[in-house]
Swiss-Prot record:
One of its GO terms (cellular component) is cytosol. InterPro entries: ATP-grasp (IPR011761), ATP_grasp_subdomain_1 (IPR013815), D-Ala_lig_Van_CS (IPR000291), D_ala_D_ala (IPR005905), Dala_Dala_lig_C (IPR011095), Dala_Dala_lig_N (IPR011127), PreATP-grasp_dom_sf (IPR016185). Mg(2+) 2 binds at E302, N304. Mg(2+) 1 binds at D289, E302. Binds 2 magnesium or manganese ions per subunit. The gene is ddl. Pathway: Cell wall biogenesis; peptidoglycan biosynthesis. It catalyses: 2 D-alanine + ATP = D-alanyl-D-alanine + ADP + phosphate + H(+). This is D-alanine--D-alanine ligase. Its main location: cytoplasm.
Length: 349
């Protein structure tokens, strides 16, 4: 029986390309090579596509995916040249142009099956302001927030923050993930510098109420009504703020899997996770991040439609705790991608 082709897209145009490379390298090592051939394509910061490597067997531990200058010495190809009949694409891409619906729309035009969120679920979860409206509509609790726009009066925005929120607050670009561009603000004097930093990444910003809470995460897997959620895990920080470097570069975090929570609280988190996932028409996978306060209040922080897939990432570790290995998880995601593709094609008839 001939092997199936799994195409890995990695790199990308966003500030989160480092995470993408780390995730893609983990995937290429964990793939079941008795079933798949893996073909890799690097997307440069400028948006060019470069065919890099091809693996028919598990690569050596020291082998790395080509990136940046090394990859750019390879010939650039037309983006459409990644097409291969019956191949499945795993877009291991984070942030804008990766999990905002852009690459998903491109792959649908090519009529390729792909792992993860569709156009709607990608774009709606990537946009923090839109996501907040959706989750509010289905009754999933969230922390209070203020919306800010770069072209509005910044003094009036500051006044609204003072009236509606208490410090500390967190200032977040509406369309960015992995803590990129996010600042913790302890007083009014630091608000404008934090807004200026966030506006570098998006002209729409969310200012959220800070809460003294545990950070609890739940992994979701499935399509349509057949959706499963894991027991939750907890992010245990030894840094003051769980920023981009502490998440992915310095690895200054630890995780408790499963989280030390009551059965009732775990069930509530799982139900909120599945409700939020279905509300945005989730497909394939998502990681739902929650705050849990000392008095037991649960707030949804965000739904991450393409969560980190590195060897120390919460999403695969949560499923491993449920008995689903990393390699089997990848196969399940490929099968879900093919199922979604068939459904989409049938709806076009």
């Amino acid at each position: 029986m001939s092997k199936e082709t799994l195409i890995l897209l990695y790199g990308g145009r966003s500030a989160e390309r480092e995470v993408s490379v780390l995730s893609a390298e983990s995937v290429m090592r964990a793939v079941n090579y008795s079933r798949f051939i893996v073909k890799t394509y690097f997307i440069t910061k400028g948006g060019e596509f470069i065919k890099t490597q091809e693996f028919t067997d598990r690569p050596a531990e020291e082998e790395k995916l080509l990136t940046n200058d090394l990859a750019e010495s390879y010939p650039k190809i037309s983006p459409a040249a990644i097409y291969e009949k019956d191949a499945v694409v795993f877009p291991v891409l984070h942030g804008p142009m990766g999990e905002d619906g852009s690459i998903q729309g491109f792959l649908e035009i090519l009529r390729l099956a792909y792992v993860g969120p569709n156009i709607l679920s990608a774009s709606s979860t990537m946009d923090k302001l839109l996501a907040k409206h959706v989750f509010e509509a289905v009754g999933v609790p969230q922390v209070p927030y203020v919306a800010a726009f770069a072209d509005e009066n910044q003094v009036e925005i500051a006044q609204e923050v003072v009236e509606k929120l208490d410090f500390p607050v967190f200032v977040k670009p509406a369309n960015m993930g992995s803590s990129v561009g996010i600042s913790k603000v302890d007083d009014l004097a630091d608000l404008q510098p934090a807004l200026s930093e966030a506006y570098k990444y998006d002209n729409r910003v969310v200012i959220e109420q800070g809460v003294d809470a545990r950070e609890i995460e739940c992994a979701v897997l499935g399509n349509n009504s057949d959706v499963s959620a894991t027991l939750p895990g907890e992010v245990v920080k030894d840094v003051g703020f769980y920023d981009y470097n502490s998440k992915y570069i310095d690895n200054k975090i630890q995780m408790d899997i499963p989280a030390k929570v009551s059965a009732d609280l775990a069930q509530k988190i799982q139900e909120y996770a599945k409700k939020a996932y279905k509300a945005v028409n989730g497909a394939g996978l998502s990681r739902c991040d929650f705050f849990v306060t000392k008095d037991g209040n649960v707030y949804l922080n965000e739904v991450n439609a393409i969560p980190g897939f590195t060897q120390w990432s919460m999403y695969p570790l949560l499923w491993e705790n449920m008995g689903l290995s990393y390699s089997d998880l990848i196969e399940k995601l490929v099968d879900l991608a093919k199922e979604t593709f068939e459904t989409r094609e049938n709806h076009l008839l």
